[in-house]
């Protein structure tokens, strides 16, 4: 019996460690960035102030799609790192190459927070984005 309890406690401590790692020290989940497609030639990488042309599909954790640029074949264009998009994008799209694809898993704190963006995005929602960087417009400093 003693051995069984030891196993249970070991498994429990491993599970709690995994949860603590995934949520971070303060109980908040962290931004997850996965590279889905790399490019062989990358002369410039995205940085703060660049104008990015992106294709994207946004989903909730359960797979419900809430937005996409693909049906209209109209890229979304914005300036990186200037607050024009959610914080998860400003952070998760840094250092990308043209043609690269990423999957971003964005906790609500870096998305739309507890308020959400009704009616499609509920409060506290974790967002999952598949993104592709089509073009970088580098802004020269004045």
UniProtKB/Swiss-Prot annotation:
List, for all copies, the residue spans of the domain called PPIase FKBP-type.
Answer: 49-137
Q: State what inhibits or activates this protein.
A: Inhibited by both FK506 and rapamycin.
Q: Which GO terms describe its cellular component?
A: endoplasmic reticulum; endoplasmic reticulum membrane
> What is catalysed by this protein?
[protein]-peptidylproline (omega=180) = [protein]-peptidylproline (omega=0)
Q: How does it sit in the membrane?
A: Peripheral membrane protein
Location relative to the cell: Endoplasmic reticulum membrane
Q: Which InterPro entries match?
A: FKBP2/11, PPIase_dom_sf, PPIase_FKBP_dom
Q: What class of enzyme is it?
A: isomerase
The residues the entry assigns to the signal sequence are 1-21
Q: What is its EC number?
A: 5.2.1.8
One GO-annotated biological process of the protein = chaperone-mediated protein folding
Respond yes or no to whether keyword Endoplasmic reticulum is given for this record.
yes
Q: Where is this motif: Prevents secretion from ER?
A: 139-142
| Record key words, sorted | Endoplasmic reticulum, Isomerase, Membrane, Rotamase, Signal
**GO molecular function, one example?**
FK506 binding
Task: Cite the record's tissue specificity text.
Answer: T-cells and thymus.
What does the subunit comment say?
Answer: Interacts with ARFGEF1/BIG1 and the C-terminal of EPB41L2.
Give a short account of what the protein does.
Answer: PPIases accelerate the folding of proteins. It catalyzes the cis-trans isomerization of proline imidic peptide bonds in oligopeptides.
Q: Which family does it belong to?
A: Belongs to the FKBP-type PPIase family. FKBP2 subfamily.
Record-linked PANTHER family: PEPTIDYL-PROLYL CIS-TRANS ISOMERASE FKBP2, PEPTIDYLPROLYL ISOMERASE
Name of this chain's protein: Peptidyl-prolyl cis-trans isomerase FKBP2
Write down the species: Homo sapiens
